[in-house]
Amino acid sequence: MTQHETTKPFDVIIIGGGATGAGTARDCSRRGLRVLLVERFDISTGATGRNHGLLHSGARYAVTDKESAEECIKENMILRKIASHCVEETDGLFLTLPEDDINYQSKFVDACRQAGIRADVIDPKEALKMEPSANPDIIGAVRVPDGAVDPFR
């Protein structure tokens, strides 16, 4: 920064360079605001840099907690829209094993769709191509729009 730049007032000062702080700084900057981001250590070295990186579709909650499922997929779609460069499209699989009730699969798919979550029934052979380490005896598979987030991008 030049001397002139440091004497101009900032519109927004954000404390913390994790996902929330950096994302807020980016959003404010894109709106034309003058932003100062203050971080004690390095960007994403706190909780953000230690997360598992899973971008939930909300499918895991669809049958038992529709409200949480709806919130997850809405936030999933917002993140894909505003920070697509941070999201890796991985999809997720929900597998039905021989000891499971295959009829539950349709209940699961219906609940996902009611919550606004894309849920595609796929052939178990296709699921095994996607995830070769899965149990080869699966009798059903559903693909959902899970993803992975790189917190350092």
PLM-predicted stretches and their roles:
Residues 44, 62, 148-149:
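Short strand->helix junction
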Residues 4-20, 36:
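Beta1/beta-strand and adjacent pyrophosphate-binding region of the FAD-binding site
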Residues 29-50:
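Glycine-rich FAD pyrophosphate-binding loop
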Residues 86-94, 128-153:
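Helix-loop-beta segment of a Rossmann-like dinucleotide-binding subdomain
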Residues 9, 102, 148-152:
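Short, solvent-exposed loop/helix junctions and linker helices
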Residues 16, 39, 96-97:
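Short beta-strand/turn micro-motifs composed of small residues
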Residues 52-126, 130:
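Dinucleotide-binding Rossmann-like beta1-alpha1 core, especially the glycine-rich loop
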